[in-house]
Amino acid sequence: MKSLKGSRTERNIMVAFAGESEARNRYTYWGAIAKKEGYVQVANIFEETANQEKEHAKRLFKFLEGGM
């Protein structure tokens, strides 16, 4: 595979990685608030969504490292 280093594609993947990471942090934060307020089921949904965002970020990072 051709190297992504310095390409627009590499920049786009890095932006996507940052977005997935930020989304995970938001969902984790909102989940903690929901749990604190007693909305356990809502907190679980936020936690599951945060885990999905984490997996997306891991795949993007792995791709940048040449692991895919």
Predicted regions and their residues:
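Non-heme di-metal
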Residues: 1-68
